[in-house]
A protein has these predicted regions:
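Exposed beta-strand-loop-beta-strand "reactive/processing" segments of non-cytosolic proteins
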Residues: 57-91, 129-158
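Extended, hydrophilic extramembrane loops/domains of integral membrane proteins
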Residues: 95-122, 143-176
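Short, non-transmembrane alpha-helical segments in secretory-pathway proteins
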Residues: 26-72, 103-137
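Internal alpha-helical transmembrane segments
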Residues: 1-32
Length: 176
């Protein structure tokens, strides 16, 4: 009888999990599609100007480990991983102006979350997260970050890295 009950519970839970697609659990079905970066549409006169822009935000003794050109809110940005004072950190730089953008502020985090979210939902709340507990829904992820809660039936929460200005993860009712 005990084995039968265990088997019934195991089978039932398996069926429940198989009905929910992993994309819905991860919130991937609520990601807005993004246009690819078109450098011709930006205010860049030549490629040399683009490649010079990260140097404007760097210090003389910085060592570049990696440079990634990507978009943030339809603008080209460089995500630089650098070593500064023997510490590795990420610096976000506007690829056109060379202005350092990181760490981003709450307003920018809100805009990034809204541009990532497929539905036109308002933001319910924004919280700056510097540390999390071992049972947090955001454990093991990049900190500091902004926790942006969307006003939506799925109770979606979008986490945005303060240093990278990028969505790191999404949580919703199905995940919880």
């Amino acid at each position: 009888l005990v084995i039968g009950v265990q088997f019934l519970l195991w089978t039932t839970s398996g069926l429940i999990f198989s009905w929910n697609s992993i994309e819905s659990v991860r919130g991937e079905n609520l990601i807005r599609s993004q246009e690819p970066l078109n450098l011709r549409s930006q205010e860049i006169d030549d490629l040399g100007e683009l490649l010079d822009s990260p140097a404007l935000a760097m210090r003389e003794d910085d060592i570049v480990v990696s440079a990634l050109l990507r978009t943030m809110l339809d603008r080209p940005v460089f995500e630089l991983t650098i070593v500064r004072n023997k510490k590795q950190l990420v610096v976000l730089v506007d690829a056109v102006s060379g202005k350092q953008l990181s760490p981003i502020d709450e307003v920018m985090a809100k805009r990034i979350a809204q541009s990532d979210f497929a539905d036109d939902a308002e933001v319910r709340s924004v919280e700056f997260v510097e540390s999390v507990g071992s049972h947090s829904e955001y454990r093991g992820k990049e900190l500091p970050a902004y926790r942006v809660e969307m006003e939506h039936t799925t109770d979606t929460v979008i986490y945005v890295s303060a240093n990278r200005g990028a969505v790191t993860t999404r949580r919703n009712n199905q995940w919880r």
